[in-house]
Amino acid sequence: MIRFHLLSAGDAIYSLSGLLRGSSALRVGTATLGRTAVEHLSRAMFLGESGINYRQRIQRTATLMEKGINEYRPSMPDHAIANSLVQQWTHFMARNRLEFKGLKAEKVSQYSVLVEKYFPKIGYVELSRPTHGNAIWVTLTVISEQQGGGASRVYALRNLAYCLDCLVTACDTVVQLWSLDIAAVERQANDDGPEPMTWNSVLQLRDSMLEIAESFEPRDYADFVDNPHPYGTSS
């Protein structure tokens, strides 16, 4: 399950980076993909957290499965498949209940709580504003774009930098959890991937992206006028 969440997060971040290659960054698209990536990474951290044993990881996985069925309505065509998967986990936990006896019941916190726990930075808030259609964010961003402020490009860079930082944190956790050999992982990744990369190059990219993102001040890309108007004039 940890691996599944990392793969999903990587897919979202790769798609996010693709939006930056165009002539105009898509401000809502990058935020939505970024938020998806960070939420997946928070679940990977929840399962791979240091200080818990394998029984607790299994219990947390089962809890995630049980919680996940809430998003599959009985009227949905894939509900039966999802429910069958959950039932398999329920039966597994029931058959092995003695092994898990005495463990404190696990609860899965909301995404925002998990993200704040494992990635305590304001980046998630920035991702959530456009995802939820925050009126203030939309107004300031559109005005900035109309005035040539480049808000979408700056927000997209900040989104990617934050996601890369979260990805590195999650990968570090997994490396320690599974005692992985980074060199072996690099070789496997380069065999499977289109472009050769090293872990050090990923860290350097993360650091450079964070440096660029942190170099911008709000006044460089956001328009804080007294009376924001969608057409850039006062009514």
What residues fall within each predicted segment?
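A cross-kingdom marker of C-terminal helix-rich interaction/assembly modules
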Residues: M1-H40, A44-S235
